[in-house]
Amino acid sequence: MANKKINVDEKRYSDIPVWRRYTLTIEEAAGYYHIGEGKLRMLIDTHPNEDFYMMNGNRVLIKREKFERYLDHATAI
């Protein structure tokens, strides 16, 4: 019996709505939260032990739900 190829439509990560993604790039997070890219980078630099971001090589990825919890408890950013 020959193996048959099954065509599966792959969803690209960019096709997933921002509010459903696990991580966001700095640019995506800036647009979504209306916080400047510089301010987001400063938050990451001043909070190196927080768990609302992770590094993928030299790229910063914001963990959306954890960052929202961080913002819920913040009085100022």
What positions do the PLM features span?
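Short, Lys/Arg-enriched anionic-surface-contact patches
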Residues: M1-S14
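Polyanion-binding surface elements
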Residues: K11-K39
